Amino acid sequence: FSTQQQREDNGREKIVDLRLDEISDFPNHPFHVSMDNEMERLVESIKQNGVLVPALVRPKESGGYEMIAGHRRKFASGLAGREEIPCIVRTLSDDESTIIMVDSNMQRENLLPSEKAFAFKMKLEAMKRQGMRTDLTSCQVGQKLNGKTSREILAEEVGESQGQVRRYI
């Protein structure tokens, strides 16, 4: 028999240290990881303090993990001489992974227009697929979206006009 506390602990996400070589990049990741001044500062920070915010990964059916959020931290960890990175392991669908990956990177400054365009397109397609799936919603899609299209919701979420989102895509 398990106690209530044990059942609650089993349901919680845990932070685990994973080897960098166990984690593959997100397929078609639209954001470039480059060696710039910000990366140099991140490498130095990781050398001094370790990785302060865990990455988010999902398990792959073939073994290992797929990076959802934390590509720059993983790259910087390697440059800092680390072999592991703290990660939250979460089971996510392809669409959930895409939406989280895009959202976690949109807060970055200095995004290239090409990165925004590809990211907006990926997220919009994932949102549209989720809108078609009845198992992901407890109400009719029209009610869930409050009469708005996926493109309108995307524009609101990223702080751009609908016209600007349309131009990017």
Give residue ranges: language-model regions:
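Amphipathic, charge-rich alpha-helical segments that serve as recognition/docking helices
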Residues: 31-32, 75-167
